[in-house]
């Protein structure tokens, strides 16, 4: 039986209805779902799970769109685990992470990466996203993936700079991608072409106006590899503070990170079951980062589990999820469901999970730190129970400065060097001048 991560205590009634309490926990080799209103205690349980997993040497990751959880978490890493840590602070302008999604992708993986990037942009722009924009972006990413020394910053240049486009297309062999650029894009009337690419240009321009995003995704060199982290029980902590870098950049980075971990899991198909080291990724405010439709996400959860990637999806309220189908797909595919205090609307959606033992009034009236939970046991659905989450773990190690310095050294580049290379790449081509003969 696997060793459980301790969460707190649960109410237990003996045969004569005498109330007692016993400890309860979760197996990290399960998907999980955590919901709770602001101030209900949700962040504390995520934090305690992460600290225990790190202390035990588990492969663990965290995507934090607020920033406080990630900043706090690195203070609990013992010195023996510092070599395992990749700490990614998107607001660290001095040392941007060297992360190039397009670098060294095998040909059979390139379509998956393309769809992941397109899905992240689609998720970000929602209602303002159009078919033609998606069509152009898909073919741009596919072309850049086939070429050497490219990054996502090359998309706009590919659209507007013919010499650069020619240098990229000379390396593309996929007939469908080549057909788009030569038989479609190049044949468009110049005015129509400008109208067609303008929405994508505007969206890219708004995103890459952020120095944080530009300096991370605009690097050609890649030092960040989710597959290596997963296979070696790494510790990945991503701080994506929306208040500092903006909603758009934070959501895009989170969506791309989630996509990359999903793709890294799928790459394990060629590895034997015994070599698929379990890795658990905890995602706070996960609706900001989802790129799949409901049916596709249900498949994603099943595939991830098969290849040793387990997700805990946490958020505040169900209105953040844009369809009941997606909500049901999640509830049907997770082993552990933990509900803190929720609104009346959310209680109506969740009471089927905990019925008949617990209903709407129970979910609405929980105190801070109280939960109603359903935990899978030995592969079978558990019986719902009321519990109390343990208080915050307090044993800080005090090595945050060392962890930040080590992650900068191993996974990042100095800002001045990054910006020098990006400036050189984006510099306009020199104008041709005629020689004047005297």
Where are these regions (language model features)?
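P-loop NTPase motor domains
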Residues: 2-17, 25-27, 32-40, 45-309, ...
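P-loop NTPase motor core of the ASCE superfamily
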Residues: 2, 23, 123, 128-132, ...
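H-loop/switch region of ABC-family ATPase nucleotide-binding domains
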Residues: 315
């Amino acid at each position: 039986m696997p060793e459980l991560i301790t969460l707190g205590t649960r109410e237990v009634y003996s045969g004569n209805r005498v109330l007692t309490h016993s400890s309860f926990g979760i197996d990290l080799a399960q998907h999980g779902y955590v919901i709770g209103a602001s101030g209900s205690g949700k962040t504390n349980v995520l934090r305690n799970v992460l600290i225990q997993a790190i202390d035990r040497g588990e492969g663990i990751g965290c995507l934090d769109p607020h920033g406080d959880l990630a900043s706090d978490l690195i203070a609990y890493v013992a010195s023996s685990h510092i070599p395992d840590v990749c700490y990614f602070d998107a607001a660290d302008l001095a040392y941007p992470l060297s992360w190039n999604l397009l670098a060294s992708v095998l040909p059979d993986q390139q379509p998956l990466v393309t769809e992941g990037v397109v899905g992240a942009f689609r998720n970000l722009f929602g209602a303002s996203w159009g078919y033609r924009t998606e069509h152009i972006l898909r073919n741009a990413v596919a072309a850049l993936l086939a070429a050497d020394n490219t990054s996502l910053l090359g998309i706009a240049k590919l659209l507007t700079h013919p010499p650069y486009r020619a240098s990229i297309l000379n390396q593309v062999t996929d007939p469908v991608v080549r057909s788009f650029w030569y038989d479609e894009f190049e044949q468009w009337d110049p005015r129509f072409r400008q109208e067609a690419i303008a929405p994508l240009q505007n969206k890219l321009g708004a995103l890459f106006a952020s120095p944080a995003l530009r300096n991370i995704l605009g690097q050609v060199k890649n030092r960040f590899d989710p597959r290596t982290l997963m296979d070696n029980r790494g510790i990945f902590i991503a701080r994506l503070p929306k208040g500092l870098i903006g909603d758009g950049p934070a959501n895009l980075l989170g969506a791309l990170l989630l996509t990359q971990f999903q793709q890294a899991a799928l790459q394990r198909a060629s590895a034997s079951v015994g070599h698929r080291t379990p890795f658990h990724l905890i995602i706070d405010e996960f609706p900001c980062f989802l790129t799949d439709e409901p049916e596709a996400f249900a498949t994603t959860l099943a595939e991830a589990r098969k290849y040793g990637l387990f997700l805990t999806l946490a958020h505040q309220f169900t209105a953040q999820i844009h369809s009941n189908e997606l909500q049901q797909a999640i509830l049907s595919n997770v082993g552990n469901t933990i509900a803190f205090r929720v609104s009346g609307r959310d209680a109506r959606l969740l009471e089927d999970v905990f019925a008949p033992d617990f209903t709407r009034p129970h979910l609405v009236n929980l105190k801070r730190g109280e939960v109603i939970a359903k935990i899978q046991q030995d592969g079978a659905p558990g019986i719902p129970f009321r519990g109390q989450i343990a208080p915050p773990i307090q044993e800080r190690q005090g090595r945050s400065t060392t962890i930040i310095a080590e992650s900068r050294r191993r996974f990042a580049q100095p800002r001045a060097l990054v910006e020098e290379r990006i400036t050189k790449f984006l510099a306009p081509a020199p104008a041709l001048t005629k020689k004047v003969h005297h």
